Curated annotation (Swiss-Prot):
Chain spans, region Scissor helix: 682-691
Regulation affecting activity: Inhibited following phosphorylation by OXSR1/OSR1 and STK39/SPAK: phosphorylation takes place downstream of WNK kinases (WNK1, WNK2, WNK3 or WNK4) in response to hyperosmotic stress and subsequent cell shrinkage. Activated by N-ethylmaleimide (NEM). Inhibited by DIOA, bumetanide and furosemide.
Binding site for chloride 1: 447-448, 603
Record-level GO BP terms: angiogenesis; cell volume homeostasis; cellular hypotonic response; cellular hypotonic salinity response; cellular response to glucose stimulus; chemical synaptic transmission; chloride ion homeostasis; chloride transmembrane transport
GO MF annotations in UniProt: metal ion binding; potassium ion transmembrane transporter activity; potassium:chloride symporter activity; protein kinase binding
Glycosylation site residues: 379, 398, 411, 428
Residues modified to Phosphothreonine: 778, 991, 1048
Native source species: Homo sapiens
Residue numbers of Phosphoserine PTMs: 32, 120, 148, 736, 981, 1023, 1029, 1032
Alphabetical list of InterPro entries matching this protein: AA-permease/SLC12A_dom, KCL_cotranspt, SLC12_C, SLC12A_fam
Ranges annotated as biased composition (Basic and acidic residues): 163-177
Effect of residue 586 to A: Decrease in Cl(-) efflux
Lineage: Eukaryota, Metazoa, Chordata, Craniata, Vertebrata
Compartment list: Cell membrane; Basolateral cell membrane
Stated name of the protein: Solute carrier family 12 member 6
Length: 1150
């Protein structure tokens, strides 16, 4: 047999065994179970899906005949050779081919051909492996099955600890973990009512009437509306942040710090802590004011007969009693915080009953107003605390005698001829109704403002009065503080704070992402309605002089809002006292825990001591610091002076919440996927502007102090964490900012929630330096929602000195294409002697500092089967191995020419994700990013995962739906059951054909090398420029062999070659005795089974994403690996094979 003839027959064998196209051999499909009747991929797969499992184990004479004919036509071997494989297949057809028939394998070659796995357990039995997922078994330790992880992923939520503690707890073995009680609180009990309790507070009962009387109904309505708009816009921003992942215990501080980073987070967290601490002081002062002024006035320790000094005595009383109250409350919190929580519902009931009493009283006043007369001297309001009758004289035993009022304004209380105050002499004493009622029309008088300086007498403008001034008497009702619009804003704003009570309880909520937005916004709407309606009701029911009487002196010392309530003023007094005490306890409970959370984050080193707690978890040191700061507020002693301080810190906090939402929305990071949809950066910016305006409106100097404190904290945290880099002039500002940002990014790998795809797109160039597959760039541009880095790279094979000009020309070509496809990024070309080395250099060295790629995008080598050169697929697998070694993600687009351009838009369709193994969550993130682009926007996401026989598919579906809910990704979920089934004869035959083809190609490459060596040498030496695209690299062994052959053809070499050809012929004869390697059979079984279910479910999908199995550890199985991937993806129009980089890229946390 002469060598040329042998070569010809070998070539015929290769094309006969693996036809490159179905049309090449009519009626013959290289993947169909019925090898004689399939003609198209669509028909082939639909038919295969319909073939019953039992039919594949029946005798298949057609298949065996086809196999025999293929071999016979190729080589015409002796009959004993041809009959052997047929007998084997017929024998196998009588028994389903499973792992139990391992005796059919050629034991002498089994281990050598087992390129994927060398495991002792394999020979003992197949139970060690999952038959249906054999393709993925090598990496099960790093990429576990989805079914084994779903339950744990779905139950990440509702944790009682913070994210940091949760990450630490994940390292504890399951046996050591304490069972956590599942939170059961819903929207009403968990968010709505706590928000109501925290928003309604002391200001409503003690100051709202005074605000209405001083500012007038219109301006008071504007104050309340502005404050409510501020909190509503903040709540919208907070809802977006809160629903952007699971918010463990830590609430608002956790949200802000994780959304804005440690510097802003620490600054805002401390502002929020100080606000909560001063809130405790304000509530305590409010409770003391109710206690000393309205409940037990005689309990006052300090007194003064001078009207101007009486307020100073009252402040001293507040300091003494406030300190005592603070110590008592701290002891209650220290000893038993659980009692505070138990009585919270009682305190809330007090608030609700008090508010209902106000509405009931307002309604009743329209037909039966309560009797609260107000004594007036001219148009001046008199205090009724010490007078017996509202007149200058009174009758006793038919005798007219001076009244007590006479004695207050005259130098003698016994005689009518005494010297009296001039104003008292010229004006009459009259009594007016303090609560005229809803139908009286008094609102017309109360519409306008009446701002007064401190010490002025409260007057009724519409009453008649002489122009005589008279002397100032302490029996008049005086203004105790200079009033203005800005002051009232600062005093009222604390009454709308407390909107974060729901997010603070996020760890106790059954579904925080649903409950927090609904509960918080409903609570704000409720409280806003109450406040706005009360402004109107107070102005319509109560006399103006009574409204401006802060402490109720004109109505016998009653609480002004209590005079309107029904059935008794005591309902409001007692209810407001207990609710204020309860709010103070809640603040003293929450503030230390907030400080503890900040201290545990360790962003402010000097606060580290406050992160410690006693045995039962109570933050003792933090409680003591909170009490000390609250004492500072109590020493101020005035509710009207503490409230603006409180406003500053809360406004600062709300400002940064709005800033966080606006920044996240504008930056559009991949992790920004709020389940709450009704937000916009403009709303957040408006909320931020209102917060800033309110800070300076209420008190510009307090605002500056608060901002300086926040700025100092920010700079301190930044100083502790990193050096500050300054620019060197205006011209270098951009460079300095970029350098500083790169140095900051260099500090470490990004947090999971900050991960975004930084793409390295590997392009193929043709001989004319044009991009072969521009759709690969189009696809990269459609992922630009990730807002990450894009580097477009390619390799020119040759010498850098000779090919530098071509590299520049190719770079310009690629840049023009990038502009056309609207890809914002960088282009980098490498000139290398070998393509694989060039690709490796690109993957290793592209990028700078933290701006390095984390994902490689490349196309599938479509012509690898047709190519006689192994370079077509060896470069591809080499690239896969390099990306895996570099811990980079890999995206392989198959049939890239079918991918849509940027001008095409799908009006409907599905993006199908087949989640087989978990390798970091790339499969979840990619379809979300694609849907941000107009091309894919109208497509729906469907996520499929595979259940085995031992899996609970119903529970898996629930867990997967829960997991996606927490990821804020809207997708249809389906669990596909793949029960263990016998390996079909078709799978066995497909594996056999694959291995025969590999063996024949190996022999043919050897023969072809010998035949063409002289011509190849001439070609290699004369080629000045070799531009080789990715997927067609030189094989290293071939090149080495060619470089060694420099001699001309000799007789000795001719004889040696004849011996090698003889061995080659023997190898071909052995092909007919081959029995497929069992590990390859099992992998082919996985590919076939998965392909069946994928094509059945996703044959009409616009895009299919699925896990890409890893390459074999033993390079001998590389070609089989390519075949497995081909089988896995056959019959699908657009496929994206995804291989994660080994780190998590998506998280449920905020």
């Amino acid at each position: 047999m002469h060598p040329p003839e042998t070569t010809t027959k070998m070539a015929s064998v290769r094309f006969m065994v693996t036809p490159t196209k179905i049309d090449d051999i009519p009626g013959l499909s290289d993947t169909s179970p019925d090898l004689s009747s399939r003609s198209s991929s669509r028909v082939r797969f639909s038919s295969r899906e319909s073939v019953p499992e039992t039919s594949r184990s029946e005798p298949m004479s057609e298949m065996s005949g086809a196999t025999t004919s293929l071999a016979t036509v190729a080589l015409d071997p002796p009959s004993d050779r041809t009959s052997h494989p047929q007998d084997v297949i017929e024998d196998l057809s009588q028994n389903s081919i499973t792992g139990e028939h391992s005796q059919l394998l050629d034991d002498g070659h089994k281990k050598a051909r087992n390129a994927y796995l060398n495991n002792s357990n394999y020979e003992e039995g197949d139970e060690y492996f999952d038959k249906n997922l054999a393709l993925f078994e090598e990496e099960m330790d790093t990429r576990p099955k989805v079914s084994s992880l779903l339950n744990r992923m779905a139950n990440y939520t509702n944790l009682t600890q913070g994210a940091k503690e949760h990450e630490e707890a994940e390292n504890i073995t399951e046996g050591k973990k304490k069972p956590t009680k599942t939170p059961q609180m819903g929207t009403f009990m968990g968010v709505y009512l706590p928000c109501l309790q925290n928003i309604f507070g002391v200001i409503l009962f003690l100051r709202l009437t005074w605000v209405v009387g001083t500012a007038g109904v219109l301006q008071a309505f504007a104050i309340v509306l502005i404050c409510c708009c501020c909190t509503m816009l903040t709540a919208i921003s907070m809802s977006a942040i809160a629903t952007n992942g699971v918010v463990p215990a830590g609430g608002s501080y956790f949200m802000i710090s994780r959304a804005l980073g440690p510097e802003f987070g620490g600054a805002v967290g401390l502002c929020f802590y100080l606000g909560t601490t001063f809130a405790a002081a304000m509530y305590i002062l409010g409770a003391i004011e109710i206690f000393l002024v309205y409940i037990v006035p005689r309990a006052a320790i300090f007194h003064s007969d001078d009207a101007l000094k009486e307020s100073a005595a009252m402040l001293n009383n507040m300091r003494v009693y406030g300190t005592a109250f603070l110590v008592l409350m701290v002891l209650v919190v220290f000893i038993g915080v659980r009692y505070v929580n138990k009585f919270a519902s009682l305190f809330l009931a007090c608030v609700i009953v008090s508010i209902l009493a106000i509405y009931a009283g307002a309604i009743k006043s329209s037909f039966a107003p309560p009797h609260f007369p107000v004594c007036m001297l001219g148009n001046r309001t008199l205090s009724s605390r010490h007078i017996d009758v509202c007149s200058k004289t009174k009758e006793i035993n038919n005798m007219t005698v001076p009244s007590k009022l006479w004695g207050f304004f005259c130098n003698s209380s016994q005689f009518f001829n005494a010297t009296c105050d001039e104003y008292f002499v010229h004006n009459n004493v009259t009594s007016i109704q303090g609560i005229p009622g809803l139908a009286s029309g008094i609102i017309t008088e109360n519409l306008w403002s009446n701002y007064l300086p401190k010490g002025e007498i409260i007057e009724k403008p519409s009453a008649k009065s002489s122009d005589v001034l008279g002397s100032l008497n302490h029996e008049y009702v005086l203004v105790d503080i200079t009033t203005s619009f800005t002051l009232l804003v600062g005093i009222f704003f604390p009454s709308v704070t407390g909107i974060m009570a729901g997010s603070n309880r996020s760890g106790d909520l059954k579904d925080a992402q649903k409950s927090i937005p609904i509960g918080t916004i409903l609570a704000i709407l409720t409280t806003s309605f109450v406040y706005l309606s009360n402004v109107v009701l107070f102005g319509a029911c109560i006399e103006g002089v009574v409204l401006r009487d802060k402490f109720g002196d004109a109505v016998k010392g009653n609480l002004v809002v209590g005079t309107l309530s029904w059935p008794s003023p005591w309902v409001i007094v007692i209810g407001s006292f207990f609710s204020t005490c309860g709010a103070g306890l809640q603040s003293l409970t929450g503030a230390p825990r907030l400080l503890q959370a900040i201290a545990k984050d360790n962003i402010i080193p000097f606060l580290r001591v406050f992160g410690h707690s006693k045995a039962n978890g109570e933050p003792t040191w933090a409680l003591l610091l909170t009490a000390a700061i609250a004492e500072l507020g109590i020493l101020i002693a005035s509710l009207d002076l503490v409230a603006p301080i409180l406003s500053m810190f809360f406004l600062m906090c709300y400002l940064f919440v709005n800033l966080a939402c606006a920044l996240q929305t504008l930056l559009r990071t991949p992790n920004w996927r709020p389940r709450f949809r009704y937000y916009h950066w403009a709303l957040s910016f408006m909320g931020m502007s209102i917060c800033l305006a309110l800070m300076f409106i209420s008190s510009w100097y307090y605002a500056i102090v608060a901002m300086v404190i926040a700025g100092m904290i920010y700079k301190y945290i930044e100083y502790q964490g990193a050096e500050k880099e300054w620019g060197d002039g205006i011209r270098g500002l951009s460079l300095s900012a970029a350098r500083f940002a790169l140095l900051r990014l260099e500090e470490g790998p990004p947090h999971t929630k900050n991960w975004r795809p930084q793409l390295l797109v590997l392009l193929k160039l043709d001989e004319d330096l044009h991009v072969k597959h521009p759709r690969l760039l189009t696809f990269a541009s459609q992922l630009k929602a990730g807002k990450g880095l894009t580097i477009v790279g390619s390799v020119i094979v040759g010498n850098f000195l000779e090919n530098y000009g071509e590299a520049l020309a190719a770079e310009q070509t690629i840049k023009h294409l990038m502009e056309a496809e609207k890809v914002k990024g960088f282009c980098q070309l490498v000139v290398a002697a070998k393509l694989r080395e060039g690709i490796s250099h690109l993957i290793q060295s592209c990028g700078l500092g933290g701006m390095k790629h984390n994902t490689v995008v490349m196309g599938w080598p479509n012509g690898w089967r047709q190519s006689e050169d192994a370079r077509a697929w060896k470069t591809f697998i080499g690239t896969v191995r390099v990306t895996t070694a570099a811990h980079l993600a890999l995206l392989v687009a198959k049939n890239i020419s079918f991918f849509p351009s940027n001008v095409e838009q799908f009006s409907e369709g599905n993006i199908d994700v087949w989640w087989i193994v978990h390798d970091g969550g790339m499969l979840m993130l990619l379809p979300f990013l694609l849907k941000q682009h107009k091309v894919w926007r109208k497509c729906s996401i469907r996520i499929f995962t595979v259940a085995q026989l031992e899996d609970n598919s119903i529970q898996m579906k629930k867990d997967l739906a829960t997991f996606l809910y927490h990821l804020r990704i809207e997708a249809e979920v389906e669990v596909v059951e793949m029960h263990d089934s016998d390996i079909s004869a078709y799978t066995y035959e497909r594996t056999l054909m694959m291995e025969q083809r590999s063996q024949m190609l190996r022999h043919m490459r050897l023969s072809k090398t010998e035949r063409d060596r002289e011509a190849q040498l001439v070609k290699d030496r004369n080629s000045m420029l070799r531009l080789t695209s990715i997927g067609s690299d030189e094989d290293e062994e071939t090149e080495t062999y060619q470089e060694k052959v420099h001699m001309t053809w000799t007789k000795d070499k001719y004889m040696a070659s004849r011996g090698q050809k003889a061995k080659s012929m023997e190898g071909f004869q052995d092909l007919l005795n081959m029995r497929p390697d069992q590990s390859n059979v099992r992998r082919m079984h996985t590919a076939v089974k998965l392909n069946e279910v994928i094509v059945n479910k996703s044959h009409e999908a616009k895009l299919v994403l699925l896990n890409m199995p890893g390459p074999p550890r033993n390079p001998e199985g590389d070609e089989n690996y390519m075949e497995f991937l081909e089988v896995l993806t056959e019959g699908l129009e657009r496929v994206l094979l995804v291989r994660g980089g080994g780190s998590e890229v998506i998280t449920i946390y905020s």
